[in-house]
Amino acid sequence: MARKLSRTAPPAKHANVQPISATPELPSAVPLMALSTGFWAFKTLAAAHELDLFGHLAGGPGTTAGELAQAVGLHPRPAEMLLTGCAALGLLEKTEGRYRNTPLSEAYLVRGKPYYFGGFVQMADKRLYAGWGRLTEALRTNRPTTWDPAVQSSLFDGEDPTMLALFWEAMHSVSTMTARKLGEAVDLRYFRRLLDIGGGSGAYDIELCKQYGELHATVFDLPHVAAIAAGKITEAGLTDRIETACGNFFEQLPGDHDVHLLSMILHDWDEAKNRALLRRSFDALPSGGAVVISELLVNDEKTGPAPAALMSLNMLIETEGRNYTPAEYSAWLEEAGFRHIETVWFDAPGANGAVIGRKP
């Protein structure tokens, strides 16, 4: 007869038997397991995106593992594993034996949708993933790992056009959704001309001009980036309200704008360059003008939040900058001459808040 293994009090006749000593109370190791395997979830998403799984399922009747295997050229075994993994991550749902996109994947992971996020997924997979694999090297050397400092002077002047196009397409998808939230959190009704400093693809300008019917904007960036923005502006049908201007924002800023936007820019640069840029912004603005710094802000205690803190490590492998705190930005703004400084918070992929300063 099998012996029961459940632990119970010893019978009376064995009262002198010492109980097994209790194991010391330990915290659960489950969070460590989740951290250690976090890349499993990302690579599942990246592989599904590369196989265009979500495009295959868009608006359709769904699929089975066998149908997916035949459609995209997979063996049925991994096809089933991929579908199961995506369902577990909330990217697919299964009803009546068929897998379909969830509202999340249908809105953001299908190519051609207005707020398509797949560009960022692709960039993270093809550019950032390898660099993060060398994070310890970056920590020891204080140098980036996603590009070679011996070949180029910064992330933004690389010679690989494919990687540059991938970067800006990724930034456009993240910026489009972030700009929408920024426009809801910051009141721009009383401004007429916005200068988007380092405006990239123009995503912020396009979204903000859609929200504010009287607003006009200028995307100010390097010539090859401004050309990308011009194409996006044309696609959006906003060439009558958004223009591009070429230049180096560390050297000059165009005048005749009453609000400046620095969206996901200052985290790329060190403190000295950021302070100089804010002084240049102050000088270029009229009295009553404002500057809006939109960023993933680290809290003033420098304990989180996790997206901002980890983004700061991403800046280590990519740039000379880091993610800064509201207190740091506020001090720099005050030093430059801005007043009535405030921080507003919101929830978006590329930023969690904005620090705003007014020129007296």
Features from the language model and the residues they span:
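Conserved beta-strand edge residues that scaffold enzyme active sites
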Residues: 99-100, 299, 347-348
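Conserved Class I S-adenosyl-L-methionine-dependent methyltransferase catalytic core
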Residues: 18-23, 29-62, 67-192
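Core SAM-dependent methyltransferase catalytic element
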Residues: 337-360
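Polybasic, lysine-enriched low-complexity intrinsically disordered terminal tails
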Residues: 1-14
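Conserved adenosyl
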Residues: 114-303, 350-353, 360
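C-terminal alpha-helical "lid/dimerization" subdomain adjacent to the S-adenosyl-L-methionine
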Residues: 292-336, 342
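Short beta-strand "wing" residues that participate in macromolecule-binding interfaces
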Residues: 94, 101, 293, 340-343
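Alpha-helical macromolecular-interaction surfaces
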Residues: 80-81, 276, 328
